[in-house]
């Protein structure tokens, strides 16, 4: 007869201190067995597919297929010194720049939530992606990575005149800055008083349009102490739109050092693979 239940038996002396366990006492746990369809078990295959574009290498390492989802594992690395991959897509990512899984008939499988641990800044960057399950009779799939964001070297210094300025004043700048391979524009700045009485200098930035396969989408403020600073991002363009830095009272000029430009690189990195060999 088919077994429907098993019992796990363990002597208490193996689980408790000797003073608490009777010599012949046992701990028992009944475990019911549930019949499952073979399709509930994951089938997986190693892929080892590689594509390099614009100094960024993407390896499609493996795929697994279950009734609930299709999971893919990728590795992203930079082939240029001083450049590190930061994330797949952009920081504020519209769907069109996120990876997609497509079958031979052009059907796109929706992405599923997945804990993408280790998503930010390592070289190489290893990431899992999950999609809706594919039919068991599927034969060919295509995995497409449209955009990868990398951190490149680069520094720029912005000087903002503050003499005679008070909280609430707007300062017109229209200053061009060269950061790595890209040019950005500091449009204006505003002094704002916080509720706790401290001053913030908010600088509005225009990081510019996409240029070929590249787009400047972000940067960082270089400072010994950035406590209290913040950034604002434009959800439509996926680009940084403003930075804020704390200011001391009576400053005549603010010197803001910008570095670590974040660049979105447009591929596509495309991988075709067979499901039938799983």
Where are these regions (language model features)?
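Alpha-helical, hydrophobic structural elements that either
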Residues: 1-278
């Amino acid at each position: 007869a088919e077994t429907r239940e098993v019992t796990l038996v363990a002597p208490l002396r193996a689980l408790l201190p000797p003073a608490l366990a009777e010599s012949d006492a046992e701990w028992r746990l009944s475990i019911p067995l549930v019949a499952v369809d073979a399709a509930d078990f994951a089938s997986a295959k190693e892929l080892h597919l590689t594509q390099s574009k614009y100094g960024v290498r993407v390896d499609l390492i493996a795929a697994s297929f279950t009734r609930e989802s299709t999971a893919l594992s990728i590795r992203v690395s930079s082939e240029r010194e001083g450049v590190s991959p930061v994330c797949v897509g952009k920081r504020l990512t519209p769907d069109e720049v996120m990876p997609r899984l497509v079958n031979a008939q052009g059907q796109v499988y929706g992405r599923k939530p997945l804990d993408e641990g280790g998503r930010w800044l390592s070289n190489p960057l290893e990431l899992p992606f999950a999609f809706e399950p594919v039919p068991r009779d599927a034969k060919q799939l295509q995995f497409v990575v449209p955009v990868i964001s990398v951190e490149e070297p680069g520094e720029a210094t912005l000087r903002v005149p503050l003499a005679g300025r008070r909280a609430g004043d707007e300062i017109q700048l229209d200053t061009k800055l060269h950061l790595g391979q890209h040019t950005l524009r500091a449009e204006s700045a505003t002094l704002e008083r916080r509720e706790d009485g401290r001053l913030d200098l908010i600088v509005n930035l225009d990081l510019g349009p996409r240029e070929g396969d590249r787009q400047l989408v972000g940067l960082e403020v270089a400072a010994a102490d950035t406590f209290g600073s913040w950034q604002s991002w434009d959800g439509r363009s996926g680009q940084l739109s403003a930075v804020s830095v704390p200011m001391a009272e009576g400053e005549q000029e603010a010197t803001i050092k910008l570095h670590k430009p974040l660049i979105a690189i447009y591929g596509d990195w495309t991988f075709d693979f067979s499901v039938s060999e799983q």
